[in-house]
Amino acid sequence: MNTTTVSLERPNVHERRRENVATDINVNALVKNASKAIAPLWPIATFVARHPWMGLEHFSFEQVVHRLKLLRDIDLYPSMAMFRAAQRKGELNPKFLEMRLQRWLDEQPLTMPREEAERFCRAALLHEEIPNELLTSSSLKSLAAKMKDMRLRYDSNHLLTRPLSLLLEEQGKEKWARVLDHQMIKWCKLFLDESQALWAMPYREKGFYYAWRKLVINDPSLNKQQRERLKDLPHDPEEALRQALMLLGIPHGEMKGYLEAHLLSLPGWAGMLLWRSQQSGQAHLLLVDYLAIRLSLEWALIAPHLPFAKQKDDDEAFLLPLLAAWMHWGGWTPEKWLQLPQAEQQARLSFAYRFDKIVRGKLWLEAWEDTQEAQLKKRIASHSQNNEPKQAVAQLIFCMDVRSEPFRRHLEQAGPFETYGCAGFFGLPIKTRELDSSHAHASCPVIVEPRHEVQEFTSAENVKKYRGRRNALLSVSHTFKKMKQHLFASLLLPEVSGPLLGLHTLARSIAPSGAGRVFHQFQDNWAQKPATELSLNRESSLETTETTDLPVGFSTEEKVRYVYQLFKGMGLTSRFAPLVVVCGHESTTTNNPYASSLDCGACGGAAGGFNARVFAALCNLKEVREGLAKEGIVIPEDTVFVAAEHMTTVDDLCWLYVPTLSEAAQKAFDMLQGKLEEVSRNANNERLSKLPGLEGKKKDPLAEAHRRAEDWSEIRPEWGLAGNAALIIGRRELTKHCNLEGRVFLHSYDWRKDPSGEALANIITGPVTVAQWINLQYYASTVAPHYYGSGNKTTQTVTAGIGVMQGNASDLLAGLPWQSVMASDEEIFHSPLRLLVIIEAPQQNIERLFEDDPHFRRKVKNGWLRLVSIDPDSGEWKAWR
């Protein structure tokens, strides 16, 4: 007879996990894959809109919503308060909610009457949430206890991919997750500091992990035992990370998820390190350091609690909300429920589990988006025109930015002017170096690699004079900053600077507009830049000692190609007006860390005027016009290109480059100049009426706009791109007579002039991607402001010269402040909708686009943006899913 020995001893989970860990873990591959859970974060001085989930687009939007809810308890769908407010304002039609519900029910394997399922779902969608009194009632707990033998399949494996420090905290142990975050914030601030701190982090030049390893053993915020555990860490960060994973007992199959969870704990600091690594050409080097430090610290903190024993799943706690749902929304009582056969009980509980808060949020959001699409369709269909436009006196090329739409509309209403829209870098992949600057700025979208550098230059004598005046101003600022940071000099600073700064504060507070004018006049008079030229020609010989890794200027072929591509992409290939104005855009604000977020996203968070000036100058070159003529684009001899900047905070045009004008161009310029004050007044009047506190008030729009731009206490000088909801790619005739309320990106495009589809493909890969990033950043900052936003402007701290925090111990805040998306504490201004892309082109052109660009097709299929095409002949709208 065979005897079987059964061990009654509980296996050591920690030892079992360590045995499962391979010693040859590919740390770099793990970190690379895990880093997709976060997005790179640019310094705030060059604020770039970031799509927080750009690395997760291979998942559907709904899958990412589920994942982040499980990992970080973040709700990525708008709240019920937002949905109900949208319904009250007429932005959300209930009929679309019912349609979405019926579509969802059609996809479900129902094992209960359809009518009952519909009643339950409608009640769950439209009625109040389950009251806490019901969830904690003795009758419900008694009912759940009677059903303890019922087994429902549900996924609780997400617990395995959450940080052990967080799980211990949730079990009532010490606040280990908070302590760990506080430690990482401290070390990241020290390492990433951009000369804001007077004393730099020792050993910083040798790397993050090296410096931390040298310093942490003397960290007084850790106890003696914790410091002892960190004394003998490996010298190599990869080996340290590998060791930490083993000591924590993380199974090989869960390592990627575990690293993701730690990156998502502080996505701002981790995102800044990711950006730094990418800038150095070593895409994930600093994240390896970061995770090696973080997991080593986690092990040092929680070692006494290892091996970690996962708590048993509580079936009763799982059943309670499902039973409460049927009591509250289904109208059942405990007595009637117990009379149901077990199979029917299980069917209803399974259905309630599937129709969870995330599914309800999905249906509400899609109904809101359907309503917006239907309203936009009605507006466009009733105003679009197919007839050819009349010959314009002047044509103006604007950035496709939503803030350009009202200005363009009022401009076209004011006279015989025609406007076009494109990405505000005007197709120029350049770095720009202003006069006497040691730094060149990438003035193109972050997804575009600069290929050229364009520099401002003038005579050596002019540079010398300008440098002297400029250095005098900078030295005052530099001295003030150094005194402020110095331990002893800071004690003298109030005595030295008090009277002058007191007067400045008083003037800025009482009369911001007047004080601003005086300040700008002084700056212009003292440090006025001399007339400069641009290094457009590759063979330009510049009197400069600056070095660059890019070619300076363009060859003739490159000049022609860039100009041709932009004209072709916009459909502007003939009928040129005597005057063509290339308009960049810039925002003017005071005391605003987020100033760059109001500038041009297509120019890397800088003003677009430099690019406008370069493009206009290229268009006036004889060799460019000759090259364009060979490609079939003939520009009349009397057509002159000029450059301007649209100041979005005050809705005005500032002239940057006006060469000698032909007679026809001069007449057009004078006519345009004569209309600008009227256009500015009307555009400001429309824009200011949407700002909180100004609704319905009688104010001089020009004066009020300038006051807000100069007032350093103004938390909302303009709305920026709040409200953005759609991007229209098509002829201006489609939308010229529509009031799109500053909510739509407008990119000019004529499918008839793009037989190959190349121009449309370029618009999709560039401008559409930038617009999507902007849209999803506003979305994230609205629906999850505590995680993806940056809180209240008035309580923010600029830290380490790179970003903002709330207080001195928060994550590096990556998103927008609530003043950028909220009208008040209770009311949102920005409607969190995924971008609706509308393309005016035949259906076969869209099909070809999908074939050629599977990445874009995936965005549409996975719900990261919405796509509609308009047939140019029939006007029929087709939604692509």
UniProtKB/Swiss-Prot annotation:
Cofactor: Zn(2+)
Membrane topology annotation: Peripheral membrane protein
Pfam families recorded: DabA
Keywords assigned by UniProt, alphabetized: Cell membrane, Membrane, Metal-binding, Transport, Zinc
GO molecular function list: zinc ion binding
GO cellular component terms, semicolon-separated: plasma membrane
Domain of life the protein comes from: Bacteria
Major localisation: membrane
Binding-site positions, Zn(2+): C399, D401, H585, C600
Compartments where located: Cell membrane
Family, similarity comment: Belongs to the inorganic carbon transporter (TC 9.A.2) DabA family.
Functional description taken from the UniProt entry: Part of an energy-coupled inorganic carbon pump.
Subunit structure: Forms a complex with DabB.
Name of the protein in question: Probable inorganic carbon transporter subunit DabA
